Amino acid sequence: MSRVSQARNLGKYFLLIDNMLVVLVFFVVFPLISIRFVDQMGWAAVMVGIALGLRQFIQQGLGIFGGAIADRFGAKPMIVTGMLMRAAGFATMGIAHEPWLLWFSCFLSGLGGTLFDPPRSALVVKLIRPEQRGRFFSLLMMQDSAGAVIGALLGSWLLQYDFRLVCATGAILFILCALFNAWLLPAWKLSTVRTPVREGMRRVMSDKRFVTYVLTLAGYYMLAVQVMLMLPIMVNDIAGSPAAVKWMYAIEACLSLTLLYPIARWSEKRFRLEHRLMAGLLVMSLSMIPIGMVGNLQQLFTLICAFYIGSVIAEPARETLSASLADARARGSYMGFSRLGLAIGGAIGYIGGGWLFDMGKALTQPELPWMMLGIIGFITFLALGWQFSHKRTPRRMLEPGA
């Protein structure tokens, strides 16, 4: 085996272990924020939505800067620094007793994420061959689901004692993740050339096809982020106990572990990437609309199952498509900018979703936020269809297995 192939194989295993750790620790804390501050402390959902939206916007919206800096200086220093900053954010969250302190803790967490997330994504593009990326992204997403369940179970168990214990555990584990990367992550460069920060950003902004694709995905993310805000609140409201939230993530894990990789393998040879993305989005949109009208957990979990199945169909195609469009001369910048749709859609989804949820309760129309999310999903579906029309998009980009 050549040294290059050996480095790629070792890199794959490192990425898988590192991804599992990061996802697990994230889900120890973040799914419980809405339960802690809305249900236990009585805050308005919009206040928590602002905090979650701020974290999302900072982490993803500034990703192009984090990626461009990583293009210049390498992945390792950015990843280690970002993880330590997220640990500081979790520690601050544990003592939050006013909205501004929760917002500040989410700001720190988001800033840490904008430092470590783009270089980690760029390492996947660097180390995984193009024909293997779709399957590798599926493996990462299966890990995401398993990590989400384990993290949510651990967080829910710790919440029985004290939310400060939840946050302290998250902070300590992120410090351990930083030490793991500092010790084992080689000093890899992300791009084929040492790209100046400004040049990497310029390359991305001049790529109109990529920019349009990323911004269109904002509507997709408005739906996707509700697994962190409105869905946990809905499950808690109907079940009457925050312990039921862990079953929501257990459903996601079961579906992902059993369906994600087989669906990706089967569909990659039969359907274009954009068809898989749009089909998943359509299923997610249809499953959102009736959620506000359900009256028991069985009905709610059935719709959540449908939502997760849509995500299982869409996510590998979305990630593979983003990676295939990245310029090898500025991988960090591209993967950083690819998060802008999540920044915009996530911020609007959290803040707007929280506001609509409060409004629906005030007007005794609980279906209001879910109907609006379904409409946004359909509009995004149509926008993607327009963008991916053959007159506008090169055929090579859309071929099965591309």
Swiss-Prot record:
The record ties this protein, via SUPFAM superfamilies, to: MFS general substrate transporter
The record's subcellular locations are:
Cell inner membrane
Q: What is any one of the record's Gene Ontology cellular component terms? A: plasma membrane
List residues in topological domain: Periplasmic.
34-98, 160-164, 235-243, 298-299, 361-367
Ranges per topology, Cytoplasmic: 1-12, 117-138, 186-213, 265-276, 321-339, 389-402
Q: Which CDD domains match?
A: MFS_MdtH_MDR_like (cd17329)
Q: Which residues cross the membrane?
A: 13-33, 99-116, 139-159, 165-185, 214-234, 244-264, 277-297, 300-320, 340-360, 368-388
Instruction: Could you list this entry's UniProt keywords, alphabetically sorted.
Output: Cell inner membrane, Cell membrane, Membrane, Transmembrane, Transmembrane helix, Transport
Q: How does it sit in the membrane?
A: Multi-pass membrane protein
Can you provide one Gene Ontology molecular function annotated for this UniProt record? transmembrane transporter activity
The family assignment reads: Belongs to the major facilitator superfamily. DHA1 family. MdtH (TC 2.A.1.2.21) subfamily.
Name under which the protein is recorded: Multidrug resistance protein MdtH
> What's the source species' lineage?
Bacteria, Pseudomonadati, Pseudomonadota, Gammaproteobacteria, Enterobacterales
